Each structure stands twice: as structure tokens, then as C-alpha cells.
């Protein structure tokens, strides 16, 4: 598979494999060192797959309610249509409603992620109240961007976390 950013081929010299981090085999200090050395942590199975499925379906149901998914909506297949703007005059309020489902918050602000971040920072941590949910259908993407400017401001005590709610190729 060819790697592209905004339609431009990424030189193979800039590509490599992601290194997976196993939480059970790492001390807190080793986690911090891995993050500092690699600039990321690739963690699998931090969140229970059942919880991911529930949150995914809750988000998909909200998207289905504005005609953006085909039935069965749990498959997450884009309909190519949308009544979102017709039914919700304020997109911010719509996405806030989607982002505040209990099942999604159980993941984004729950004990599993909180525990990982607390281990990394060495102190108790909490998740943001505001999350940026990116519901993107197959073949589409969120253009290349940098989260640090939006989240970290002038502190090094903020980390962003990307969660996938379906199988993806890495």
C-alpha cells in the first residue's frame, strides 16, 4: 500500500513500522522513556472490545438518526446523505451530544485510559471534558494536522490519545 498525505506520496525513507508497547511488561519509568524516545505509545487492548462496540454503535446510531449511515447502521457504512444541518441548526451542539454519550465517555474519561496516563505522568490524571470525535468513513481521512497547539498550550503535561472504534490497517 502506498502512503499518501493530501494526495502526495510519502518517501519510503520516512516510513517505518510502529513499535507496540505492552503495558504489562513496562514499569512507569519505561513507559515514560518509550514515549520520550519514540514520541508515541502504540497500545492495544487497553479498552475492552465490548465497550468499544457499544460506544461505536451509540455513535453510529446518532449518525443514522441524521441519515448518514445505511441500515444496518451498526456496519457504519456511509449513506452519502446527511440531514444533520436540516435537523440540527448548530453542528457544535450536535457533536457535543454525540460526544457525551455515556458509553463513549466510559472509554475517553474512564479508568482504563486514566490509569495509563497516570502511570506516564506519575501522578493522578484526568481526561478533557471536551473531546474531538472524528467520525470518518472508509476512504476518507482527517487532513494532516497537529493537535499540540490546540491542547497543550504551554504545558508538557497534556497528551492526546487516538482511539479507533473499528479494525484498521496500520
Map each language-model feature to its residues.
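Non-heme Fe(II)-dependent double-stranded beta-helix
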Residues: 1-37, 44-144, 150-151
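Short, conserved beta-strand element in jelly-roll/cupin
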Residues: 152-170
Amino acid at each position: 500500500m502506498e502512503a499518501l498525505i493530501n494526495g502526495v506520496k510519502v518517501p519510503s525513507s520516512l516510513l517505518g513500522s510502529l513499535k507496540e508497547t505492552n503495558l504489562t511488561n513496562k514499569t512507569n519509568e519505561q513507559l515514560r522513556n518509550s514515549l520520550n524516545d519514540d514520541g508515541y505509545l502504540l497500545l492495544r487492548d487497553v479498552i475492552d472490545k465490548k465497550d468499544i462496540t457499544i460506544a461505536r454503535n451509540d455513535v453510529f446510531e446518532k449518525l443514522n438518526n441524521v441519515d448518514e449511515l445505511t441500515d444496518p447502521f451498526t456496519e457504519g457504512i456511509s449513506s452519502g446523505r446527511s440531514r444533520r444541518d436540516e435537523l440540527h441548526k448548530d453542528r457544535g451542539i450536535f457533536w457535543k451530544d454525540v460526544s457525551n454519550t455515556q458509553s463513549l465517555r466510559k472509554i475517553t474519561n474512564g479508568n482504563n485510559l486514566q490509569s495509563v496516563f497516570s502511570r506516564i505522568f506519575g501522578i493522578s490524571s484526568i481526561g478533557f471534558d471536551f473531546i474531538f470525535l472524528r467520525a470518518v468513513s472508509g476512504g476518507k481521512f482527517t487532513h494532516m494536522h497537529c493537535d499540540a497547539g490546540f491542547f497543550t498550550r504551554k504545558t508538557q503535561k497534556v497528551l492526546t490519545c487516538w482511539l479507533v472504534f473499528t479494525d484498521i490497517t496500520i
